[in-house]
Amino acid sequence: MFAVLKTGGKQYKVQAGDVLRVEKLACEAGDKIQFNDILMVGGDSVTVGAPFVAGAAVQAEVIAQIKGEKTIHYVKRRRKHSSQRTKGHRQQLTLLRVTDVLASGADASGVAAATGTADARRAAHNASAKE
C-alpha cells in the first residue's frame, strides 16, 4: 500500500519502510509522528482526495535532525569593481522512516500530528503574547 503525503510544501509518494528527508519538523529523534495531509492512498484500489483523503494517515518515526548539502551561491555585486562574494547555505532537514500507511482510522491511532518548525514558533509566540 502506498500514499502521497504533503509536508513542507512538497509531495512525497511513500510506503511502509521508506526513509525520507523532509523539511525540518518540530520533533526529536525517536519520536513517532503522523501526517494527516494525505492526497492519495493506493493499493488494491486507489482513493484520491479532494483535496485530502478523510481518515487516512501516514505514521513515521524520526531518525535524526540533519542538514542538507551545502549550496554555494556566487555573488558579483557591481560591474567594473572587483567586489565578489560567495554565500553558502545548508537546509535543516528531518530524516524519517515510514512505519505504517493507514487508509482509515487515523483519528483513533493516538500518535501526535507532525508540525513544522514555523508552526511551533508561532504557537510559542502566541503563548508568550497571552501572558
Swiss-Prot record:
One GO process term, biological-process aspect: translation
Region described as Disordered: 111-131
InterPro entries recorded: bL21-like, bL21-like_sf, Ribosomal_bL21
The UniProt record lists the keyword Transcription: no
UniProtKB keywords: Ribonucleoprotein, Ribosomal protein, RNA-binding, rRNA-binding
UniProt keyword Glycoprotein present: no
Gene Ontology MF terms in the entry: rRNA binding; structural constituent of ribosome
GO cellular component: cytoplasm; ribonucleoprotein complex; ribosome
Entries under SUPFAM superfamilies matching the protein: L21p-like
PANTHER family (UniProt xref): 50S RIBOSOMAL PROTEIN L21, LARGE RIBOSOMAL SUBUNIT PROTEIN BL21M
Family (UniProt): Belongs to the bacterial ribosomal protein bL21 family.
SUBUNIT field: Part of the 50S ribosomal subunit. Contacts protein L20.
Purpose: This protein binds to 23S rRNA in the presence of protein L20.
Protein name, as recorded: Large ribosomal subunit protein bL21
Record organism: Cereibacter sphaeroides (strain ATCC 17029 / ATH 2.4.9) (Rhodobacter sphaeroides)
